[in-house]
């Protein structure tokens, strides 16, 4: 005999399955994509660049650039990936409620996220032949500072991310580093000049330091 708990679990699984299917159909309107297992869920990829994540019945879309500020305005929270001993917050935003209530407002955001992920992938593919000083906003002086802080190359810089690179540099130089370096590192990570960073994006970065 099936218990009430088992029935409720089955209903929840069916609802999750329907939600995922509706989201996949929604994304199809914007272009072709393929699915791969990621973070215990399903990652959505366009031209080998991941732009969305579906896991535990929740829908997440990749942030980056001006999209972050739009997600913040809409009250979307970042995805927290629970590891064995730590919780890592990654740049994917929970859009489950937004998809359920205002799917039309999500179309342009998902489209921009897809484009951002493709551009970043192209940028990262070209990193093998680049030096730190070749990144936007970086010069020889900053390259030396970053290397002294334990970030040896472009690959490591992009892997660690602007916020943690800034933390390392700030720690190495006694906590007396100009906050502009955070903007410069964020621009270098995104492939843009630091003056193009919008104020909401800067505030979001500051909150992570």
From Swiss-Prot:
Keywords: Competence. The keyword Cytoplasm does not apply. Disruption phenotype: Defective in DNA transformation. Transmembrane segments: none annotated. The keyword DNA-binding does not apply. InterPro entries: TfoX-like, TfoX-like_gammaprotbact, TfoX_C, TfoX_N. Induction: By chitin oligosaccharides, but not with polymeric chitin or chitin monomers. It comes from the Bacteria. Pfam families: TfoX_C, TfoX_N. GO terms for biological process: DNA import into cell involved in transformation; establishment of competence for transformation. Belongs to the Sxy/TfoX family. Required for DNA transformation jointly with TfoY (tfoX2). PANTHER family: PROTEIN SXY. This is DNA transformation protein TfoX1. The lineage of its organism: Bacteria, Pseudomonadati, Pseudomonadota, Gammaproteobacteria, Vibrionales. The gene is tfoX1.
């Amino acid at each position: 005999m099936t218990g009430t708990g088992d029935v409720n679990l089955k209903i929840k699984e069916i609802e999750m399955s329907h939600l995922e299917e509706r989201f996949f159909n929604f994304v199809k309107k914007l272009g072709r994509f393929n699915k791969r297992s990621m973070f215990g869920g399903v990652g959505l990829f366009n031209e080998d660049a991941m732009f969305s994540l579906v896991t535990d019945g929740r829908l997440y879309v990749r942030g980056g650039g001006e999209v972050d500020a739009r997600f913040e305005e809409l009250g979307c929270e970042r995805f927290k990936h629970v590891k064995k001993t730590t919780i890592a917050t990654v740049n994917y935003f929970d859009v489950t409620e937004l998809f359920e209530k205002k799917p039309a407002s999500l179309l342009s955001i998902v489209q921009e996220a897809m484009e951002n992920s493709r551009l970043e992938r192209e940028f990262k593919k070209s990193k093998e032949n680049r030096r730190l000083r070749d990144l936007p906003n970086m010069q020889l002086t900053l390259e030396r500072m970053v290397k002294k802080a334990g970030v040896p190359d472009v690959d490591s810089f992009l892997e660690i991310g602007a916020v943690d690179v800034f933390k390392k540099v700030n720690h190495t130089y006694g906590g007396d580093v100009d906050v502009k370096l955070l903007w410069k590192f964020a621009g270098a990570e995104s492939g843009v000049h630091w003056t193009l960073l919008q104020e909401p994006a800067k505030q979001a970065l500051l909150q992570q330091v």
